[in-house]
A protein has these predicted regions:
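Metal-dependent nucleotidyl/phosphoryl-transfer cores and adjacent nucleic-acid-binding surfaces
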Residues: 1-561
Length: 561
């Protein structure tokens, strides 16, 4: 395999140890340095020269201890060299093609992280660590390249270096078009002209390409003197790879410029964003070690509500073609909160000193939103019947519950029986008008619920903590950078850097899967005989994916280490 040959060459480079080379400018920079390049604290005479051991390039001044402790990557700390290999949509599709080719013992132990048998986030073969660029830039390559092109063609270094003709360059600085469903066998590659436009139809999108896209395909065919569809196919793939390289390298450059971190050392954008946040805020969060406190907070994490309260609406007003003046004028409104995640994350948030305390309800309710101390409470709530009609469209205090027949109206039961539907065995987050028992929530939510008419019938537990707006520095930084952004690529990037952190603040490690890829029959037999064995998917006689029950769970999120 050519990629394995390339791996050997890269390993030789990474294992090299080049002496430091300093220019006169480097020497002057080092002499005038006042802060460590690693910890950013003052040097105060404790200054050594840090350099890249691969290139020999001087990187900056640092404390002696910081320089000794620094490792290029987490893998290097374990003396393991990993070479990142990026695919766009590796998790959802492309990864399957590669995995099915790993059915040989020569590839050794294959390390992987998977969500399930269909979605492989990353897997490592020898030193090659396969990653999904879509987990960082969750848009189509077409949109990503279009956004980047707003800044100019100089952003596409890889593409420009491989294509010298300017007219050809202009054609390739965008996502190409391809007749996916027309290519059904290798004989099609011998055809000497593009298929008609209707053959570019996509069942997934339920449409064909536009006339301008088809003209673009013809221009590419003619300008590159393509002889058959096979050559068109190869150029299409080459262009995709070059554009992805340009897009991701620009993403890396932006990340390093603003956060001094390289995304290639992370699995997903949320992983990267969390470390970027820790660098910006320098926050040290308390790590919960009391299981009762941890489980109480877990109980309050319910997810987001997704529901339809009004199933069908029609507008009738003078701006519509079918306006009926004899009927009442009505409008449909679409409402969206700007920077909702950002606003939520600049509030006072739990930070440290989590302790169970004895507090009166009145004392909790009188605590200001921006007080130095906050509370998570466990209460019984009564939902007065006189509020049911008023709150029916959007009840307060939603709950995770399995919906049974007793929870359905007569109309819903009739509909269920007519359609022969079965009750779901999976819990859903359901807004309802029932009373609540041992309901866990933040004290600001409790104040809101009581203001709207709910009643606390019993206060069970109170978890007090020190709070501050410790995320505000990071959120404001990204918001300001987004306002200064010169193109859509950067605007989307800084928005994602805020939103990605939100999910990491409430990551549920219990949901992590333990899936292994086995290409050794003896190893599979040994694993399948263990009590933790759960299930497997057989790819062929030499390759199987095995899922195991987790024997331990490390409750270590969120953390600031």
């Amino acid at each position: 395999m050519k990629i394995l040959d390339t791996e050997d060459k890269i390993i030789k480079i990474l294992k090299s140890n080049t002496e430091m080379m300093m220019t006169e400018e480097d020497k002057l920079t080092h002499k005038n340095s006042t802060h460590c390049r690693f910890c950013h604290k003052e040097l105060n005479g404790d200054s050594v020269r840090d350099h890249c051991h691969v290139t020999g390039k001087y990187r900056g001044a640092s404390h002696n201890k910081c320089n000794i402790n620094f490792k290029e990557t987490p893998e290097e700390k374990r003396r393991v060299i990993s070479i990142p290999v990026f695919f766009h949509n590796l998790t959802g599709y492309d990864g399957h093609l590669i995995i099915k080719g790993l059915n040989d013992k020569k590839f050794g132990n294959i390390r992987m992280i998977a969500q399930n048998f269909e979605k492989y986030m990353t897997f490592q073969v020898r030193h090659l660590k396969f990653l999904d660029s879509f987990n960082f830039l969750s848009s189509s390559l077409d949109k990503l390249s279009s956004n980047l092109a707003q800044e100019g063609e100089h952003k596409f270094n890889n593409t420009l270096n491989n294509i010298t003709d300017q007219e050809q360059r202009n054609l390739l600085l965008r996502k190409g078009v391809y007749p996916y469903e027309y290519i059904t066998n290798k004989e099609v590659f011998e055809e000497t002209q593009l298929p008609p436009i209707e053959k570019f139809y996509s069942s997934l999108n339920e449409c064909s390409i536009s006339e301008s896209d088809y003209q673009h395909a013809q221009d590419v065919w003619n300008k590159f003197n393509i002889k058959n569809i096979g050559e068109y196919h190869d150029l299409y793939l080459k262009t995709d790879v070059l554009i992805l390289a340009d897009v991701f390298e620009n993403f890396i450059n932006t990340a390093v410029e603003f956060y001094n971190l390289d995304p290639c050392h992370y699995l997903t954008l949320p992983n990267f964003a969390w470390d970027a946040m820790l660098r910006k805020t320098e926050i040290e969060l308390d790590q919960l070690t009391d299981i009762d406190k941890y489980q109480m907070i877990e109980k309050g994490l319910r997810g987001g509500i997704s529901m339809i309260t009004h199933r069908h609406g029609e507008a009738n007003n003078k701006y519509l073609k079918d306006y009926d003046p004899s009927k009442e004028s009505t409008y449909l409104s679409y409402l969206d909160a700007n920077n909702l995640y950002g606003w939520a994350m600049i509030q006072q948030l739990p930070e440290s000193n989590f302790n169970f305390v004895d507090k009166e309800l009145s004392e909790i309710l009188s605590t200001d939103d921006d007080d130095n101390h906050g509370y998570i409470v466990e209460v019984d709530l009564h939902y007065p019947k006189e509020l049911h009609d008023l709150h029916n469209d959007y009840p307060l205090a939603p709950e995770q519950m399995i919906v049974n027949d007793n929870d359905l109206s007569a109309y819903q039961l009739d509909l269920k029986n007519k359609m022969e539907l079965k009750n779901s065995k999976v819990g859903k987050l359901v807004p309802n008008l029932n009373d609540k028992k041992r309901y866990v929530l933040h004290y600001r939510n409790l104040k809101y619920y009581l203001d709207k008419g709910l009643i606390v019938t019993k206060l069970h537990r109170v978890l007090q903590f020190t709070q501050s707006n410790w995320l505000k520095t990071y959120i404001d930084f990204n918001t300001n950078q987004r306002a200064k952004a010169k193109n859509s690529f950067e605007k989307d990037f800084f928005k994602l850097m805020n939103n990605a952190v939100f999910g990491k603040t409430m990551e549920n490690v219990r949901n992590h899967s333990d899936i292994q890829l086995i290409n050794d029959g003896d190893k599979f037999t040994k694993l399948a005989s263990k009590p933790k064995y759960k299930s497997c998917v057989i790819f062929d006689e030499n390759l199987v994916a095995v899922e195991c029950h987790k024997t331990t769970v490390k409750l270590n999120k969120p953390n600031s280490n």
